[in-house]
């Protein structure tokens, strides 16, 4: 599938319509993951880049269109109102965490969100503009109006899809889960993508960079550091 560059509405612009009187409900699931094995078991969400923790940066990246936010991971103080949940059993992987988060969102309002933003906590260069582009790509008319995209996924410079920086139609994503929702332990994220109609959104300015090692963290801290004052 070819990458697209969708038109972008201003940050906080009006909701896409899914019906004449039913605005699309946009929610988000932020996945904090476990302790990074290449980080000596350190909790990624608590690491700081540019004076903010990775969790704070992820929450700040969520556009104003996102009404409800579920964080899959340990409960910690946050400035933005969020709900916390965990996949059962813990350690089931990102697909299990994402499905658990969507289940929490469904229980919160009594129905599924129309669109759900999935964002890994270890992508600190993702911004509201990134999420706006993904939402715009999902809502853009495709070549077949009867078969609209079911997911808009960020793609890095090497062409690798980033399924944890994406926007999904929640019902379509859950329909792609093989078997029952509670049997997602260890399910690869790529398995969920197999049955979905995807649109790829190219990353800009390092948006797809993630934190897997101490070297990654050092590089990202240097990248966002302000320039030294002129002598």
Task: Give the role of each language-model region.
Residues 210:
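PAPS-dependent sulfotransferase catalytic core
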Residues 219-220, 231:
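Acidic two-metal-ion nuclease catalytic site recognized across multiple nuclease folds
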Residues 3, 15-186, 194-206, 214-218, ...:
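Nucleotide and nucleotide-moiety/phosphate-recognizing core
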């Amino acid at each position: 599938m070819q990458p697209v560059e969708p038109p972008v509405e201003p940050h906080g612009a009006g909701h896409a319509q899914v019906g004449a009187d039913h605005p699309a409900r946009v929610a988000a699931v932020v996945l904090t993951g476990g302790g990074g094995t290449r980080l000596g078991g350190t909790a990624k969400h608590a690491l700081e880049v540019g004076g903010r923790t990775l969790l704070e940066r992820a929450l700040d990246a969520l556009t104003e269109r996102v009404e409800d936010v579920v964080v899959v991971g340990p409960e910690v103080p946050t400035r933005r109102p969020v709900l916390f949940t965990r996949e059962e059993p813990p350690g089931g992987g990102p697909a299990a965490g994402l499905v658990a988060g969507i289940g929490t969102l469904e229980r919160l309002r009594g129905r599924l969100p129309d669109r759900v933003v999935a964002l890994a906590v270890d992508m600190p260069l993702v911004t509201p503009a990134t999420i706006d582009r993904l939402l715009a790509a999902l809502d853009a008319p495709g070549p077949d109006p009867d078969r609209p995209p079911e997911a808009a996924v960020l793609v890095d410079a090497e062409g690798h899809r980033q399924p944890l920086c994406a926007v999904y139609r929640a019902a379509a994503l859950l329909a792609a889960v093989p078997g029952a929702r509670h049997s997602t332990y260890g399910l690869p994220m790529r398995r969920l993508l197999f049955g979905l109609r995807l649109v790829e959104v190219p990353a800009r300015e390092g948006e797809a960079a993630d934190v897997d090692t101490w070297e990654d963290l050092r590089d990202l801290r240097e990248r966002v550091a302000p320039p030294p004052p002129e002598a």
